[in-house]
Regions:
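Conserved AMP-binding/adenylate-forming
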Residues: 117-160, 164-166
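N-terminal amphipathic, basic-rich helices that act as targeting or association modules
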Residues: 1-64
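AMP-dependent adenylate-forming
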Residues: 14-15, 77-103, 215-217
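A short N-terminal helical cap/helix-turn-helix that marks the beginning
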Residues: 30, 38-51, 70-91
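Adenylate-forming
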Residues: 29, 77-81, 107, 111-114, ...
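Conserved AMP-binding A3 loop
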Residues: 103-105, 238, 246-265
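ANL superfamily adenylate-forming
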Residues: 96, 179-242
Length: 265
């Protein structure tokens, strides 16, 4: 059963609708946008806290200036935190043939520990944390820990050269940069630590936190934080406005400096 079919059934049952096809559903969604977005938050169980003067849509004559979920509070990571089971959350297999399986319970523990470490550095809502990292579990965890405290995340792949990273991160003035020791591409190992000093000097000299490409008995600085009981006390998730920044992606930079594309919660 598809999500769309399940959603149609939800509307038919809870909103007394009798949609016969997708076109009817679409017409209803644009004619009654407040009802549509309300139903979406209910169907997907989006955690939203209503405040005084909250509006599902603060309308503007220009569509792109509409303010969705105005004055509602939430946090993206709550969608992850509500699952604290031993179900598989991340399954990683590296080019070095190392395999790593992380349950939702373990994922939440690691995110909690890392967010506690961030707070120990006085990183707060609106501050920027960046990752110069390959596609590994630590990258996901670093992002989620940033979201948990209301900080803003951005990242560059570890195969980016120094200039490409500087062009992006220099626009953000990060408080912390998380890096790995190496990455693999097409079966070959590549070190990229030689880029770090140049990059840091051009983006405001943020503190650096190092991890290692996944391996057996990972003793990297980041993994020591995961294991450190000092950071195991439960951290409260920071509630933010729905439209507060969550992460920044960048355009390709083919027509000048890469453009920041900011995504909210």
């Amino acid at each position: 059963i598809s999500n769309l079919y399940a959603y149609e059934n939800y509307l038919n049952k809870n909103y007394k609708k009798k949609f016969k096809n997708y076109s009817q559903l679409w017409n209803w969604s644009v004619k009654y946008p407040s009802d549509f977005w309300k139903s979406i938050t209910e169907f997907y169980q989006v955690p939203l806290i209503k405040n005084k003067n909250s509006k599902l849509i603060q309308k503007n004559t220009k569509f792109w200036k509409n303010n969705f979920f105005y004055n509602f509070q939430t946090n993206y990571i709550q969608l992850i935190e509500k699952n604290n089971s031993n179900d598989l959350a991340i399954h990683f297999i590296g080019e070095n043939y190392h395999e790593e399986k992380i349950t939702y319970k373990e994922l939440n523990l690691r995110v909690n520990a890392l967010s506690s470490y961030y707070r120990s550095l006085k990183i707060k809502k609106g501050d920027v944390v960046v990752g110069y990292l390959p596609n590994i579990a630590d990258t996901i965890i670093s992002f989620l820990a940033s979201a948990k405290i209301g900080a803003v995340w951005s990242s560059c792949s570890s195969d980016f050269g120094a200039k490409a990273v500087i062009d992006r991160f220099s626009q953000l003035k990060p408080k912390l940069m998380i890096v790995a020791d190496h990455y693999f591409y097409n079966g070959k190992k590549f070190e990229y630590s030689k880029n770090l000093r140049q990059i840091r000097s051009k983006i405001g000299n943020p503190k650096t936190l190092k991890t290692s490409y996944p391996c057996k008995n990972n003793r990297s600085e980041l993994h020591r934080i995961y294991r450190n009981k000092k950071y195991h006390l439960e951290e409260k998730t920071k509630l933010v406005d729905f439209n507060d920044p969550l992460y920044v992606l960048f355009s390709s930079g083919t027509t000048g400096l890469p453009k920041c594309i900011t995504h909210g919660h």
